Regions:
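Conserved active-site tyrosine of GNAT-family acetyltransferases
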Residues: 19-24, 92, 120
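Charged catalytic carboxylate motif
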Residues: 18, 84
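Vicinal oxygen chelate
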Residues: 1-10, 30-81, 87-116, 126-130
Length: 130
């Protein structure tokens, strides 16, 4: 068996417009795929450098037949490297993103903050400290 050739995290979004404002508008993801190709997307892929993120619209139906959301807590968090954690938190707060952890220098040499995306997924923002 050959090793996997690619791993792409996928998130569910209740409002694709709000998800795009967060991931494309503020964090700078580049839309590289949309389905359907015209009109309002139900799925899209964004590229961040060499990494890709899939976002699917919550529809109530899944291919696997399981709920799209956990009963409580969270099952995934994203870690996104940015140039300026503080400026990014200000911009995301400006579009209504809740801040779970204000920017703070970490002992391992990074400045980090946590915000929630429009669907409550935790997003860790990191940059080199100092």
């Amino acid at each position: 068996m050959k090793p996997a050739s690619r791993v792409m995290p996928m998130l569910s979004a209740a409002d694709m417009g709000r998800a795009l404002a967060f991931y494309e508008g503020v964090l700078g993801g580049e839309k590289i795929y949309q389905f359907p190709p015209e009109g309002d997307p139900v799925f899209l892929t964004l590229r961040f450098g060499t990494t890709e993120l899939g976002i699917g619209l919550l529809s109530g139906q899944t291919l696997h037949g399981r709920p799209q959301r956990p009963a409580s807590g969270h099952r995934i968090e994203l870690c996104i490297n940015v140039d300026d954690v503080d400026a990014c938190v200000v911009a995301l707060r400006g579009i209504g993103a809740p801040v779970a952890l204000e920017p703070v220098d970490q002992p391992w040499g990074e400045r980090a903050a946590y915000v929630e995306d429009p669907d409550g997924n935790l997003v860790m923002l990191v940059a080199p400290a100092g």
